[in-house]
């Protein structure tokens, strides 16, 4: 498991000029952007950040994913293939994620949160920031316009493998031009919405507690459950602990495949101990039992991690260790749109963390 900066560095090492990797690095930029938005909003990413950019003709929203979708028997060859792949492997290509989300929200009338929660149960790389905010982007509740696709778009990017054998070819839900789809799905025009301005959160990477640290405990969290955690890099000889929070299990309902993937990631961390409990109390108790006098944790935008860290910090000195920087975000003052963020950081994001040989 690699950090965003490490993936960027690997991509830049494979090209002669940084500009040749710009499109891929921009995709990584979305992940950095989503994390910054989650850090600013916390659990509010589970509610609409803006009113929908367009009003649906089908005004009511389903609060669940329909059974025919979950059972991959919609009759849409592409949709049924995407659902089958998601359930069987815990992974979908980014295009497939967007197509499936768009069809569910705009054609079937499923509330984006129901779809986002369903994805999060299954995706091995499930990340609430990227997942839920991407669904909001598709729905138009965190975007200038909703995301639509048509059969021509899908056929182009899949070489027709879904469309040619589909029994609904020529009469499917996404048949027609974008203008025709727009007219079928949305009310003409759009609601007036004030410009969205979203200030970044203050840097969380700051120490808490008092006194010197001689024997820290490294607390691994869901987004740092790997040997590459910066907290482990800062304290390579320290005891390390991962706590499975029953509240997380109840909230996200991860599938067995997702849990196995998590354990496989942790298996790469020598000496890690895995326990079940409330991190706010389990981490200090475990630290005391092992003779540790402080806690180190990797930076995380997750509100549950931050709340637990605040509680731990009242009992032990706690240090937040930053990840390798993907970009210089010091000039970012508005996260309301990705384009504003990317305009501020794109040049720095195209520079490697460690210059390549001869660079």
Give each language-model segment a name:
Residues 2-10, 17-201:
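Active-site-proximal binding-pocket segments
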């Amino acid at each position: 498991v690699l950090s965003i900066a490490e993936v960027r560095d690997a991509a830049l090492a494979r090209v002669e000029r940084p500009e040749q990797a710009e499109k891929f690095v921009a995709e990584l930029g979305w992940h950095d952007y989503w994390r910054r938005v989650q850090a600013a909003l916390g659990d509010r990413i589970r509610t609409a950040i803006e009113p929908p950019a367009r009003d649906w003709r089908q005004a009511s929203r389903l609060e669940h994913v329909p059974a025919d979708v979950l059972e991959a028997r919609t009759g849409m060859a592409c949709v049924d293939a995407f659902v089958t792949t998601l359930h069987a492997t815990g992974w979908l290509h980014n295009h497939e994620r967007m197509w499936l989300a768009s069809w569910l929200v705009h054609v079937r009338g499923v509330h984006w949160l129901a779809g986002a929660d369903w994805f999060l149960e299954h995706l091995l790389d499930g990340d609430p920031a990227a997942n839920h905010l991407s669904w909001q982007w598709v729905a138009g509740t965190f975007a200038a316009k909703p995301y639509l696709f048509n059969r021509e778009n899908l056929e182009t990017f899949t070489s027709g493998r879904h469309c040619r054998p589909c029994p609904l070819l020529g009469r499917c839900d996404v048949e027609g031009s974008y203008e025709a789809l727009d007219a079928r799905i949305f009310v003409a025009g759009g609601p007036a919405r004030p410009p969205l301005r979203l200030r970044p959160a203050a840097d969380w990477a700051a120490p808490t507690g008092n006194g010197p640290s001689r024997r820290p405990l490294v607390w691994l969290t869901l987004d740092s459950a790997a040997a590459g955690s910066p907290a482990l890099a800062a304290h390579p000889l320290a005891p390390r602990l991962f706590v499975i929070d029953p509240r997380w299990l109840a909230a996200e309902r991860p599938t067995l495949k997702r849990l196995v993937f998590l354990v496989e990631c942790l298996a790469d961390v020598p000496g890690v101990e895995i326990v079940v409990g409330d991190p706010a109390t389990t981490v200090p108790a475990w630290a005391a039992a092992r003779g540790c006098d402080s806690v180190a944790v990797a930076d995380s935008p997750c509100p549950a991690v931050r709340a637990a860290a605040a509680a731990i910090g009242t009992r032990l000195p706690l240090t937040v260790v930053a990840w390798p920087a993907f970009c210089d975000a010091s000039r970012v003052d508005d996260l309301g749109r990705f384009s504003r963020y990317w305009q501020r950081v794109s040049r720095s994001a195209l520079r490697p963390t460690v210059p390549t040989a001869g660079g």
